[in-house]
Amino acid sequence: MKLAIRIGGATIALLLIGVAGLWIASNRRDAGRMRASVEIERAPEEIWPWITEPEELTQWVGWLAEVKPDTTSPAEGIGHRETWVMDDPRARAKMMVPGTVTLWEPPDHMGVHVEVPGEFSADVLYTLTDLGNGNTRVEQDGRYTYDSRLASLLEPLRTPGNMRKVFDDMKRLKEKVEAVPEDPNQGVHDDDSTSTAPADSTGR
C-alpha cells in the first residue's frame, strides 16, 4: 500500500514538474516565433512572384493545396486578402487559413497577418535582401499566438515540428527558383546607350 502511494505521489510530482516546465517554456521571450532563411542564386525580382503568386506558392509551401484570393479585396498590395487551403496529412480535414497583406514593398518586404478563429493568429514577415551578383537572402519571420490555454501550454512541443516544416519549405523554394532558367534581362535598363535593343520590361 505504501509503495503504491509512493509511486502515485512520484507520478503526480513528475506531472506537475512537466506542466511547470511547459508553462515556463511557453512564456519564454521567443515563444511561438519561427524564423528561417535561405540564400538563392537569383535576383530579388525573380524570387518575388514565388512568395506572392498562387501558382508559385503551391509549388514550395508544404501542404498548401490551393490559394483562394478574395476578389472583394485589392488584387495585390496592402489590404489584399486570400485564403490558404492547407491539406495536412495528419489532419482529418483541410484547414482554411485566411491572411491579409499588411506590408507591401516589392521586391524587398511583404508582411501578412494570419488569423484562424479558435486556433491561432500570426504575423509573418518576408524579407528579400539583395546580396549582389544575382544572389538573394530570403528570410521568413513569423510570430504565432494560440487562442486556447492548452495550445499555448503545448507550444514548446509544437514549434520544433513546425520549424522543421518551415526549413523544408525554404529548401524547396530554393530548389524550385533555381530550377528556372535565370532571366538575362534582370538588371538591364532602357537608358543603356550601348544596348542595341530595348530591354524587356514586361518580365516579373
List PLM regions with ranges:
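Juxtamembrane/transmembrane-helix boundary motifs in multi-pass membrane proteins
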Residues: M1-K2, A151
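Hydrophobic ligand-binding cavity/cleft-lining segments
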Residues: L3-I7, T11-T71, G203
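Glycine-rich portal/gate segments that line the openings of hydrophobic small-molecule binding cavities
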Residues: I5-G9, E39, P69-L125, N133-R137, ...
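Extracytoplasmic/periplasmic, Sec-exported soluble proteins
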Residues: E39, P49-T52, A93, F120, ...
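Solvent-exposed, polar/charged alpha-helical surfaces in well-ordered, non-transmembrane soluble domains
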Residues: E45, P49, E55, R164-F167, ...
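A short acidic/glycine-rich loop-to-helix N-cap element
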Residues: Y144-D168
